[in-house]
Amino acid sequence: MSILSENNPTPTSITDPNKSSHLHNPELNSGTRVASGPGPGPEAESTPLAPPTEVMNTTSANTSSLSLGSPMHEKIKQFDQDEVDTGETNDRTIESGSGDIDDSQQSHNNNNNNNNNNNESNPESSEGDDEKTQGMPPRMPGTFNVKGLHQGDDSDNEKQYTELTKSINKRTSKDSYSPGTLESPGTLNALETNNVSPAVIEEEQHTSSLEDLSLSLQHQNENARLSAPRSAPPQVPTSKTSSFHDMSSVISSSTSVHKIPSNPTSTRGSHLSSYKSTLDPGKPAQAAAPPPPEIDIDNLLTKSELDSETDTLSSATNSPNLLRNDTLQGIPTRDDENIDDSPRQLSQNTSATSRNTSGTSTSTVVKNSRSGTSKSTSTSTAHNQTAAITPIIPSHNKFHQQVINTNATNSLSSLEPLGVGINSNSSPKSGKKRKSGSKVRGVFSSMFGKNKSTSSSSSSNSGSNSHSQEVNIKISTPFNAKHLAHVGIDDNGSYTGLPIEWERLLSASGITKKEQQQHPQAVMDIVAFYQDTSENPDDAAFKKFHFDNNKSSSSGWSNENTPPATPGGSNSGSGSGGGGAPSSPHRTPPSSIIEKNNVEQKVITPSQSMPTKTESKQSENQHPHEDNATQYTPRTPTSHVQEGQFIPSRPAPKPPSTPLSSMSVSHKTPSSQSLPRSDSQSDIRSSTPKSHQDVSPSKIKIRSISSKSLKSMRSRKSGDKFTHIAPAPPPPSLPSIPKSKSHSASLSSQLRPATNGSTTAPIPASAAFGGENNALPKQRINEFKAHRAPPPPPSAPPAPPVPPAPPANLLSEQTSEIPQQRTAPSQALADVTAPTNIYEIQQTKYQEAQQKLREKKARELEEIQRLREKNERQNRQQETGQNNADTASGGSNIAPPVPVPNKKPPSGSGGGRDAKQAALIAQKKREEKKRKNLQIIAKLKTICNPGDPNELYVDLVKIGQGASGGVFLAHDVRDKSNIVAIKQMNLEQQPKKELIINEILVMKGSSHPNIVNFIDSYLLKGDLWVIMEYMEGGSLTDIVTHSVMTEGQIGVVCRETLKGLKFLHSKGVIHRDIKSDNILLNMDGNIKITDFGFCAQINEINSKRITMVGTPYWMAPEIVSRKEYGPKVDVWSLGIMIIEMLEGEPPYLNETPLRALYLIATNGTPKLKDPESLSYDIRKFLAWCLQVDFNKRADADELLHDNFITECDDVSSLSPLVKIARLKKMSESD
């Protein structure tokens, strides 16, 4: 008779007739209870086993002459059944036998549950049986002694049956089994169904009850061999259906368990020829370790998804789970051992075991001494592959360690997802298998540790995923970063790293060094604030970016600080190339500073207004050494700003520079000149661009230079490679082209490089200045290819923005004219230092050619602009393609661009990438701005009246002029007596169109007696007409400057203003620009607030604002300090306006705006010139308005109840002042 185990589908032979006879005892029936352990424990002996009664019926299908059928026949029959049940499973199982992955995947889930169940057994009760079983004789596979089949009959007493049961348990416990053959989930469920440790399985009238019973017995015996017997309370037999499902799940659930046939002739055994079984974990010989801290198994099992299959089956049979009792608490655990995916023999390598300590948690386990582990290592051996040979009994502490390991694994895997199973370093194999396990461990870690889907257990998944996240996380490089310099303060209170433009600003604004040291943080805040408000913050950031790149020499904008090498000559080139704020938007694909420079030469981009277009051309072209110092010395955008007037509002003076320093750089090869730090930063800073002027085109052309190329170029400053690079005269700037064209031109130049990929400067242009050396460009191209950095070619950038290289005819003409310029670096130096006659001739011819070229390109630029306007809403790629096509078609009649620019930018230069990224961001911002403008115009069309205001309002009389339009008076056609004020604005010239929409919307929704009434708005031919109520009395500024106001009159103005502010604040609107200019009066003295362009909307989400707007002298400290602010900023401005009415001007009006901001931020509440002459009420009111801490500052409603307001005069008291102001104003105008 064969006993089929779920872990070993091959029948196991029984040689002892005494031990096999009880299987055929007809008394064995559904009530059979199997001894719980391999040895006869005291409790096992006292437990009677009811003999089965229908054994013969279950084997009636057997045709063997034996009473219970032939063992071989049973084996064949069982194999056939297994083939159906475990068809695909066997393949995976066989793979796992050789250390494959399946073992670590599916069996991990099943075996964790089984291990917990196995560990519940009492290790002490198995010691005695271990002694008995060690001397069992060996048996041969497939042999049977059939005499035992006839010794017992149906009337055998129960004692004999019990002895047979125990002997069969002992015998089967010695059978070899594959690693990881702990109970499968199916067997565990069967055991849980009966709620006993040894699992009583009852079969009632089932056709295959004997086979199922044999299968169950084998599993129980194997389980008992690993776990000590435990007293089991009597069990209520389960129903036939549940028992059948439990038993049938034994085979179906064993998907990844190792299976070793006991019959070597079996066909399945051939598949397992490569498998090496592990040792039978013996019985524990040492005393049990102290129990670990209590573990709430229920919580662990609830959290873990590993028990999903077991729990489902267990819940179906309404049986309690054995894992949920407290028996596991008495089993010692080790925190440095665990089961690797599927249960295997304990690792024999102590060091490998200890390595796993870091991968497991010690929170729920108790550490044991390692003496037992090291002891067992020396005595453990491996089983033979066949089960026929009796295995050598391993040392006793081996089993103890395995129990510990199993328990630790179950606890840890469910408690902390540290990847115990998958990433385990401890492979419980013995002998040589341990070595292969270490290899497989790495495979598991690499294959499953990073893949969530491959692991079947959630705990191991989470552990491996946490590990993989750490490994796989890739932090991208920063983008959109604008912080390029850090300004610090040393111990002496002086600034470190302060940008030069900031130093100039501070010195020009009258902020002394002492004041800077007293309030260093305030100075930095107000300077940053001033820059943000006086210029485009994005442009300022890009300027710093540009400057910083020069400083580090890592960026492609190498020539930003070099004298404007732009052919347009003049500092504008340097400004444009060098990072003037406005130029940044035009530096799109940094890939072509060259083309960009061509564009900039021809077109002065709005941001790059050339310093003095004519002066700069000649001063830099003819006498480069005179003005270059200023450009080069600062090395910061400030210098460019100053000279190029990029930021006209900035009063900073030019920094002094040493023109002779340029001579030091002049002898350098163009490459070194183009590099910001070619030899030393000091040289470049101090050097005037005289040499740069000569080589200016080459400098500007340089895109980005890698560190390698920098070194190589430095080492070969005087090498022959650069002998022919002669200084090219910068082309004159082109004032004739309007700004709008310059923008499109720069875009076209940028777009072209994108397609051409011309990152290395267009070398062919160099031929323009070296007639005899037309082949030189190729030579230099090859040379620079090796360095992967673009050479600084002296190509003529003045050409139109579209073609990177000047026309061929121009090149040949220039070549013939100035061949000697490229002879050698020494010659280049001589040309720079020698009289300017040759240089002037070159410049003249160059300018003439450039002028012709510009005239031809003017029409093309206009066409490009129109095309760009049509394609504004398309994505950047489409727009680029369109512009490139237009550019190519436009430039084809002149000269095709040289193919050299098609080189890709050097990937090795990090600075080039940064520069390219900055240029792309700039281009993107421009596109976004255009889209935003279109959206604003579309919004205005929906807000404004589509009619023609000229049909409704006549007799327009201009009474004022603003930055973006004029103010007119007109009569309403519908009521001639009604005079209205019309604010006419050119949207193209309006810097912040969104403010207009804001103003219209606020005025439309703000109908209040103290707010100027909004009548209507019109959008006519690009001009916005805003029709408002006309306040003929003028502004409060006229009264303040032409008369002296009493406290009562001041109180009236404050009261009416506070009423309007209270209304605005109640609607969530902050005016942010309260001052006398925005308080209008009529002839009767009525007061109304106007100019809502800067007003801000406050909502629940954004209860405070941090933008910086308004007029500096009236600004609250929290705005100047760039802190969050709320409606109380209008109260501060009202307090400043009171001082204005008292003293005729706001505080610090005579100071520069920057110093005024500094004083506001540092002085706090401004001091009155003559406070003694004022009453207590006005001083108290004023102090309440001018609290530096806005939390202590009053709001509009509180101020309206102040005595100063309640006791003020009537509005009619202002009428005389209005009339006086009008008379004085009229007399002044006459």
Curated annotation (Swiss-Prot):
Sites where the protein binds ATP: I959, G960, Q961, G962, A963, S964, G965, G966, V967, K983
**Compositionally skewed regions (Pro residues) per UniProt:** 789-807
Q: Which GO terms describe its cellular component?
A: cytoplasm; nucleus
Q: Where is the composition biased (Low complexity)?
A: 57-70, 96-125, 248-257, 349-381, 439-468, 670-683, 696-710, 736-749
Active site: which residues? D1073 (proton acceptor)
**Which GO terms of the molecular function aspect are on file?**
ATP binding; protein serine kinase activity; protein serine/threonine kinase activity
Q: Which reaction does it catalyse?
A: L-seryl-[protein] + ATP = O-phospho-L-seryl-[protein] + ADP + H(+); L-threonyl-[protein] + ATP = O-phospho-L-threonyl-[protein] + ADP + H(+)
Q: Where is the composition biased (Basic and acidic residues)?
A: 150-161, 614-628, 867-876
Which residues does the annotated region (Disordered) include? 1-384, 413-470, 545-831, 867-919
Q: Which residues form the Protein kinase domain?
A: 953-1205
Q: Where in the cell is it found?
A: Cytoplasm; Nucleus
Task: Return the PANTHER family for the record.
Answer: SERINE/THREONINE-PROTEIN KINASE SAMKA-RELATED-RELATED, SERINE_THREONINE-PROTEIN KINASE SAMKA-RELATED
Please give the function described in this protein's UniProt entry.
Answer: MAP4K component of the MAPK pathway required for the mating pheromone response, and the regulation of cell polarity and cell cycle. Phosphorylates histone H2B to form H2BS10ph. Required for hyphal formation and virulence.
Q: What is its main location?
A: cytoplasm
Q: Which organism is it from?
A: Candida albicans (Yeast)
Question: What are its GO biological-process terms?
Answer: filamentous growth
The name on file for this protein is Serine/threonine-protein kinase CST20
SMART domains assigned to the protein according to its UniProt record, in alphabetical order? PBD, S_TKc
Q: Which domain of life is it from?
A: Eukaryota
List, as start-end ranges, the regions of compositional bias called Polar residues.
1-20, 175-197, 207-224, 237-246, 262-277, 311-330, 550-561, 604-613, 629-642, 750-761, 811-826, 877-892
Stated EC number for the protein is: 2.7.11.1
Q: Which Pfam families match?
A: PBD (PF00786), Pkinase (PF00069)
| Catalytic class of the enzyme | transferase
Q: Does the keyword Iron apply?
A: no
